[in-house]
């Protein structure tokens, strides 16, 4: 999964802090117990000396295997003596052990060269946190997408807005369940407050849980940041071009609300075209109709969307207004 360098660095930093904290706490416990049980100091000195002797044995002994086996036997006996001493004084035999947040990998993030589950879960949490800073990701699930808010009346032989919403929800659940880096791109259309963002974020929730990297943002914010990056204005950027082009799933919300100029149009086309070429899925939402898109952008952008994306149109009344 192609997480950003920032996400990897943040996860590794958390692991490093966990390990450092566990090590310091273990040292504090050791100092406290050694002060209460002086015999522990004697055992620790003997164990340290055995460690040095084992190292020397490789270079000085005529029978290194025999001597190392003997030293290891002495070490095991001392370790057993230490456990018994702790028990005798009312402590568990592992009272001096380092208590890692993740005992499986000892807070390194890796087991036999492969990512530990704790590292994977950290990456997921960081992806989720980034989106939750700007959008209600936790609230937007398929379970909370209520189609009862859509009108149930059908006109001119068409299906009702409610039935349409139910079908789109079913399609989105299926899409999210089977999501991969090769999934098709989606294009949500419909008026304000009809659930386009909700469904996009519901898919994001599932994709993140499956271990995929996700970037969510409005067209205005993403294209604005990319324009600033292009002109060297690098302070406070949330989005960078290489991450936008490479992320497993890009969600571009509210297309058409951005400040339009020659650069943003060119940048938008590059995002759409590059990700189509790389077979990476993108979810775009807009309040515009296809005709309005043609008027606002050019034929190149609209034709790439209509030709390569699955079009999903929600109808009805502004749900946010109804909920009030």
Segment roles from a protein language model:
Residues 174-178, 225-250, 266-274, 300:
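Conserved alpha-helical scaffold flanking the Walker A/P-loop in AAA+ ATPase domains
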């Amino acid at each position: 999964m192609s997480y950003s360098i920032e996400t990897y660095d943040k996860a590794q930093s958390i692991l490093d802090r966990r390990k450092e904290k566990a090590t310091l706490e273990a040292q504090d416990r050791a100092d406290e117990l050694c002060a209460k049980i002086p015999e522990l100091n004697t055992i620790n000195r003997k164990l340290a000396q055995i460690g040095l002797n084992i190292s020397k044995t490789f270079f000085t002994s005529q029978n290194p295997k025999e001597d190392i086996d003997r030293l290891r036997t002495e070490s095991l006996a001392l370790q057993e003596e230490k456990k018994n001493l702790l028990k005798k004084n009312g402590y568990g035999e592992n009272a001096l052990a380092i208590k890692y947040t993740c005992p499986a990998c000892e807070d390194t993030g890796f087991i036999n060269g492969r990512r530990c589950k704790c590292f994977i879960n950290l990456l997921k949490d960081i992806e989720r946190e980034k989106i939750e800073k700007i959008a209600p990701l936790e609230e937007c699930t398929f379970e909370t997408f209520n189609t009862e808010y859509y009108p149930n009346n059908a006109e001119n032989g068409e299906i009702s807005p409610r039935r349409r919403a139910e079908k789109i929800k079913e399609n989105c659940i299926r899409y999210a369940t089977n999501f991969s880096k090769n999934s098709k791109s989606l294009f949500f259309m419909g008026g304000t407050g009809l659930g386009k963002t909700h469904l996009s974020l519901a898919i994001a929730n599932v994709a993140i849980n499956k271990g995929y990297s996700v970037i969510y943002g409005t067209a205005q914010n993403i294209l604005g940041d990319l324009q600033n990056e292009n002109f060297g204005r690098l302070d406070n950027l949330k989005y960078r071009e290489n991450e936008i082009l490479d992320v497993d799933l890009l969600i571009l919300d509210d297309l058409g609300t951005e400040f339009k100029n020659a650069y943003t149009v060119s940048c938008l086309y590059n995002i759409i075209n590059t990700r189509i070429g790389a077979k990476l899925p993108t979810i775009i939402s807009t309040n515009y109709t296809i005709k309005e898109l043609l008027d606002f952008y050019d034929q190149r952008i609209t034709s790439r969307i209509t030709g390569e994306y699955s079009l999903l149109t929600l109808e009805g009344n502004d749900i946010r207004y109804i909920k009030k």
